[in-house]
């Protein structure tokens, strides 16, 4: 892809002070999508504001503002990204008690992370002014997702805000949709900005963000990808499986779309951007500080970094750091923060140097080596399913809970999902890294990690028809030293199998890293060397150029997350790293299979849930007036009953006999076998009248014992003299008329014949 000075700008001034630019996204036979950026009409007091439209129906406002004074006490860039979902965007009133928007939804939080990850590294190093990006969803076509539109809107508003920002950043979702016709070479087409309906028929989809570099190529900055819920079904039907090679093709397919979006933003900025202001920058350290720290610490630090154990290594590094800071404190009085930052930088240089030149890592492993693995199941006594997965010092406890489908999470957001049957929650307590900190509601990082593990497992979960349960999976990070999110995937697979969930295939995950630099080769020549690392440590994650997490089965990828600091990764390097990840995943799956290979028997503490189908026109009869019938069944059997609009009935109970009793009662109403003359029942008197007693034989099926039959041959003046409501009465069906009305006679339990047959006197 090359840039040409003759390229015509897409930006125009539509009215005084209002500018817009357009990016046309051509999907061939799948049609064209239009992304339009407009500025100058809304939120004019923000440093930069842009309204982004997708096909004129979906409308997002992004406003970027910056603080006036720097927060020089911070040692990080204070960027905040917020996504505000407005329910009026979908023509809805919020479902909360106060009927207004409250805390952000999970979708909004995940979108914040999608925006933050590519935007943050695009700002100049050393910036300490607070920058806030607020994206408000004003209108949403229900067939579209807004998250990738939000990435572009946030980038565009930041690009024109006069900030030291090296954008623009383009974001696109591409989905691999299988070919339906005879020509299926390549397995399908990567479609940009797919609709919700198109995603339902896709094999794989990914959100990719990047920017155009000087060469005209697109540097990928962030990837969030997943296999779809129907991937196994589609692959069995002949669709292309989302292997590592297919994923790499998808990244290449996304680049032209990202380039168009970046150029539309750049065109808008050329007309409407404010001049870049001068902001004070606070470099982490001065050159003199770095030289002093390097000279004082390099030799000892190099030895400390070869210690294999995390705690022992970190204790030694902390000891060296304190000694160096004490030694240099007088020379650099008042610059203690610079000393700490320089020490970190020297550590980073040594870690990378050891990897690139020696081919060894700080814990002594080779580049593709995995740490010691351990897997066991059934570690929490009363849990429905549990497992403990360890990879080196990373330790994850997975716990599964099963319940009725009615316990599925109800989702009140702008997304197409209204309920979640599978819920994955990830907890990262401070003790997992040997620290103290806040414990309580999950932070954005925890929500993001839980969502990644959830996406990795959804493709292999059984359907609701095959397994009629709501499933809550909790991942507890008990120890952390590298990729607890991928450890959560492994622990969750084990825990789900232990709970008896019939997964379509086991899933494992691994975190990969990439380190690159210009080095001198054996011939004395300079070359750029790329080294992929398997199963990265926390330090390698922090000091590397790219980290990506890959989860999947033995056959294909189910989820992928990638973040890189490089301006482009050669495709062969990425393909090699993905292949390396596949080998590691297979090794982990082998270890997991030794712990548990097939679903266990369900825990005795888990509810037994059965799904049955009844005619839709019988739902009212099963429920009864004011819920009388269903409440009676629940009371009699102790089962929980949930009825869907399509006639699916979920029956749950703590034991099998209770569930079966409830099912029999429901079937007796909804799928009745008509009773026959001569059948006997032990019924309950449900009503008395002047002419007889009504006896319930089955739920919803009553018969009448005439007053003349109640006296055992003697005349009865009043029905209540013989029976009352609630009494048990053994009866036999004497007759069923053509309208289905049942006539009953009492049965003497000690005799073979009905009691009323002996004397027929008094019959009216």
From Swiss-Prot:
* Cysteines joined through disulfide linkages: none
| Reported cofactor(s) | Mg(2+)
Q: Cellular component per GO?
A: cytosol
Location in or out of the cell: Cytoplasm
Q: Does the keyword Isomerase apply?
A: no
What residues bind Mg(2+), as annotated? Answer: 541, 547
Q: Return the EC number.
A: 2.7.7.8
Gene Ontology biological process terms from the UniProt entry: mRNA catabolic process; RNA processing
> Taking every annotated instance into account, which residue ranges of this chain make up the domain KH?
607-666
Pfam families, alphabetized: KH_1, PNPase, RNase_PH, S1
- InterPro entries, alphabetically? ExoRNase_PH_dom1, ExoRNase_PH_dom2_sf, GPSI/PNP, KH_dom, KH_dom_type_1, KH_dom_type_1_sf, NA-bd_OB-fold, PNPase
Q: Which residue intervals define the domain S1 motif in the entry?
A: 678-747
Q: What catalytic activity is recorded?
A: RNA(n+1) + phosphate = RNA(n) + a ribonucleoside 5'-diphosphate
Q: A Gene Ontology molecular-function term? A: 3'-5'-RNA exonuclease activity
Alphabetic keyword roster: Cytoplasm, Magnesium, Metal-binding, Nucleotidyltransferase, RNA-binding, Transferase
Question: Which SMART domains does the record match to this protein?
Answer: KH (SM00322), S1 (SM00316)
Q: Describe the family membership recorded for this protein in Swiss-Prot or TrEMBL.
A: Belongs to the polyribonucleotide nucleotidyltransferase family.
Q: PANTHER family, alphabetically?
A: POLYRIBONUCLEOTIDE NUCLEOTIDYLTRANSFERASE, POLYRIBONUCLEOTIDE NUCLEOTIDYLTRANSFERASE 1, MITOCHONDRIAL
Describe the task this protein carries out: Involved in mRNA degradation. Catalyzes the phosphorolysis of single-stranded polyribonucleotides processively in the 3'- to 5'-direction.
Q: Tell me what this protein is called.
A: Polyribonucleotide nucleotidyltransferase
List the source organism.
Nocardia farcinica (strain IFM 10152)
């Amino acid at each position: 892809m090359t840039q040409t000075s003759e390229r015509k700008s897409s930006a125009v001034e539509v009215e005084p002070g209002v500018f817009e630019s357009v990016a046309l996204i051509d999907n061939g036979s799948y049609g064209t999508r239009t992304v339009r950026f407009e500025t100058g009409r809304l939120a004019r007091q923000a440093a930069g504001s842009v309204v982004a439209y997708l096909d004129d129906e979906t409308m997002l406002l992004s406003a970027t503002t910056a603080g006036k004074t720097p927060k020089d006490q911070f040692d990080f860039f204070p960027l905040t990204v917020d996504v505000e979902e407005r329910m009026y965007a979908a023509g809805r009133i919020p479902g909360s008690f106060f009927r207004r928007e409250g805390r952000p939804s999970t979708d909004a939080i995940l979108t914040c992370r999608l925006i933050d990850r590519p935007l943050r590294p695009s700002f100049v190093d050393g910036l300490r002014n607070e920058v806030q990006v607020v994206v408000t969803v004003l209108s949403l076509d229900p067939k579209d997702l807004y998250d990738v539109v939000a990435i572009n809107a946030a980038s565009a508003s930041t690009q024109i805000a006069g900030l030291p920002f090296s954008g623009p950043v383009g974001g696109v979702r591409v989905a691999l949709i299988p070919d339906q016709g005879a020509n299926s070479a390549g397995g399908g087409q990567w479609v940009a900005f797919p609709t919700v309906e198109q995603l339902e028929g896709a094999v794989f989809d990914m959100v990719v963000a990047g920017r155009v570099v000087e060469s005209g190529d697109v540097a990928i900055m962030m990837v969030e990808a997943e296999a779809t819920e129907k991937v196994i079904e589609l692959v069995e039907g002949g669709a292309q499986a989302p292997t590592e090679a297919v994923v790499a093709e998808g990244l290449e397919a996304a680049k032209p779309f990202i380039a168009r979006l970046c150029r539309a933003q750049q065109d808008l900025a050329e007309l409407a951007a404010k001049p870049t202001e001068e902001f004070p920058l606070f470099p982490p350290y001065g050159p003199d500080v770095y030289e002093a720290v390097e000279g004082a610490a390099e030799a000892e630090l190099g030895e400390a970094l070869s210690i294999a154990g995390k705690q022992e290594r970190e204790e030694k590094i902390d000891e060296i750091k304190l000694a160096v800071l004490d030694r240099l404190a007088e020379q650099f009085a008042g610059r203690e923060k610079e000393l700490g930052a320089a020490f970190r930088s020297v550590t980073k240089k040594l870690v990378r140097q050891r990897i690139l030149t020696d081919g060894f890592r700080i814990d002594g492993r080779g580049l593709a080596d995995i740490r010691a693995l351990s897997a066991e199941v059934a570690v929490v006594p009363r849990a429905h399913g549990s497992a403990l997965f360890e990879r080196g010092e990373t330790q994850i406890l997975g716990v599964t809970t099963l319940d009725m489908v009615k316990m599925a999470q109800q989702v009140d957001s702008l997304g197409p999902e209204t309920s979640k049957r599978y819920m994955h929650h990830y907890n990262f307590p401070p003790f997992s890294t040997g620290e103290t900190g806040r414990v309580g509601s999950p932070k954005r990082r925890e929500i993001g990690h839980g969502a990644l593990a959830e996406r990795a497992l959804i493709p292999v979960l059984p359907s609701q028809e095959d397994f009629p349960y709501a499933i809550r999976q909790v991942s507890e990070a008990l120890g952390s030293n590298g990729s607890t999110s991928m450890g959560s995937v492994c622990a969750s697979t084990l825990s789900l199998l232990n709970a008896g969930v019939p997964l379509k295939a086991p899933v494992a995950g691994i975190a990969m890293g990439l380190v690159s630099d210009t080095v001198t080769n054996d011939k004395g020549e300079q070359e750029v060397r790329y080294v992929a690392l398997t199963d990265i440590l926390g330090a390698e994650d922090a000091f590397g150029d790219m980290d990506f997490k890959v989860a999947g089965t033995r056959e294909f990828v189910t989820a992928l997350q990638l973040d890189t600091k490089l301006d482009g990764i050669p495709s062969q390097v990425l393909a090699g790293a993905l292949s390396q990840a596949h080998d590691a995943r297979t090794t982990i799956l082998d270890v997991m299979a030794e712990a548990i290979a097939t679903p266990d028997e369900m825990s005795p503490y888990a509810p037994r849930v059965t799904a049955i189908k009844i005619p839709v026109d019988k739902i009212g009869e099963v429920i009864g007036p004011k819920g009388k019938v269903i409440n009676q069944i629940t009371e009699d059997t102790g089962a929980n009953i949930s009825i869907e609009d399509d006639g699916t009935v979920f029956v749950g109970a703590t034991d099998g006999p209770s569930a079966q009793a409830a099912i029999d009662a429901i079937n007796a109403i909804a799928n009745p076998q008509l009773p026959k003359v001569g059948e006997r029942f032990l019924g309950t008197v449900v009503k008395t009248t002047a002419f007889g007693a009504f006896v319930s034989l089955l739920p919803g099926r009553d018969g009448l014992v005439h007053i003349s039959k109640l006296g055992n041959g003697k005349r009865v003046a009043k029905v209540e003299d013989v029976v009352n409501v609630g009494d048990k009465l053994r009866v036999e069906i004497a007759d069923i008329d053509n309208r289905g009305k049942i006539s009953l006679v009492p049965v003497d339990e000690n005799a073979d014949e009905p009691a009323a047959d002996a004397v027929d006197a008094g019959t009216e």
